[in-house]
Structures are given as structure tokens and as C-alpha cells.
A protein has these predicted regions:
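Glycine-rich flexible loops
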Residues: 1-188
Length: 188
């Protein structure tokens, strides 16, 4: 997780520290242009990606890298997610893109994400996770939530296609339920 402090600096979480035990003094001030920082703790291994986003998008003030389950499943398939829910389209656009695989924690990953993400607020990373950004942390968290919901819907839709099962007919289900469970009547 990182937050832009000004046009040249971000505060970023350290690598290898449990967020539940994180203290304010553990946060690292880092120059987004040079990646220089002070202190004994190492910054997040995805610092290159965070910095690349801040350098490219001046309106972004918060970046979150995470590994939500549905998004990671889609990213492992190197698929892109159509955003069908209109309430998320204004935040995510019509499609959540997936960046080509690159080794984690490398400039190569940052470049791959930036090529695919462009001005979008979120992007899947093949075989890795997601990156989400926003004007503030609240919006960045909302982007992750919207991405995960969209990925869930996409997976559920595709499981139906893979299984060959159609959506069940609600009217038929009600009829079966009433016939089978209606008190006092024998099952027909």
C-alpha cells in the first residue's frame, strides 16, 4: 500500500511486516523518481510499480497491490474481465485488463502493467494479483472491491458455460418445492 505525499514522494509500506503489527514509524518515505529512501526497513517489493503509477498518473494518490481470490483466479487464466455491472463501469470501464506475466518485484512487471493499465484505475497481473489505484485510499479500496465482484461474476458465468448447466428455471423450482414440501400433501 502506498500514498502520494507530494509530486515527488510517496509513503509506502515495508516489505515483510505483518500489517496487523504495522506502526506509523514503520512506514517509508520514498522518492518516486529515484526510489531513494531512508531507514532500515525495506520498502514493498512492488515499489517500482507504485512509483511508475504515480509518475504516469498525477491524479492518483493511493495505490494498493493485493491478491483477492477471484481476481487471482482470472489472472492465472490470463483472461480479461468484462465489467457488466453498470455501477462499477464508471470506476473500472468496460473491461478489466490483464497485464502479461513478468517476474514479481521487477521493473519488467511495472512496465507490463503500465502498458496494459494505461489510465485505468485497476489491472490484473497474470499469475500474480491486482493493482488498484485511486484519488485516495478509499477509492483504491473501492476499486479492489469492484474488481473482485466483477471477477466473481465472470467466474460464475463461465462455470455455468463449462458445466453445460443452464440457469435453473425459478418457476419450475417453486413448483417442485411446493409439490414436495407442501404439508399434508403426498409427493406427486
Amino acid at each position: 500500500i502506498s500514498v502520494r505525499v507530494d509530486q515527488n514522494n510517496m509513503i509506502i509500506t515495508p516489505s515483510g511486516i505483518d500489517y496487523a503489527r504495522l506502526k506509523e514509524e514503520d512506514l517509508i518515505l520514498m522518492d518516486i523518481n529515484t526510489l531513494e529512501y531512508e531507514g532500515d526497513l525495506k520498502p514493498s517489493s512492488e515499489k517500482d510499480l507504485h512509483a511508475a503509477i504515480y509518475c504516469a498518473q498525477k491524479d492518483i494518490n493511493a495505490v494498493i497491490h493485493s491478491h483477492p481470490s477471484y481476481c487471482c483466479s482470472v489472472a492465472a487464466a490470463h483472461a480479461e474481465v468484462p465489467v457488466k455491472d453498470t455501477k462499477w463501469q464508471s470506476l473500472l470501464g468496460q473491461t478489466i485488463k490483464t497485464a502479461k506475466y513478468a517476474l514479481p518485484s521487477t521493473v519488467g512487471l511495472a512496465n507490463s502493467v503500465m502498458r496494459k493499465k494505461k489510465d485505468a484505475k485497476g489491472c490484473l497481473m497474470a499469475n500474480h494479483g491486482v493493482i488498484a489505484c485511486g484519488k485516495d485510499l478509499d477509492q483504491a479500496f473501492e476499486v479492489i472491491y469492484a474488481m473482485e465482484e466483477s471477477a466473481r461474476e465472470y467466474i460464475e458465468e463461465n462455470v455455468k458455460k463449462i458445466s453445460g448447466k443452464e440457469e435453473f428455471d425459478v418457476e419450475s423450482m417453486i413448483e417442485i418445492f411446493v409439490r414436495k414440501y407442501n404439508k399434508g400433501n403426498k409427493e406427486r
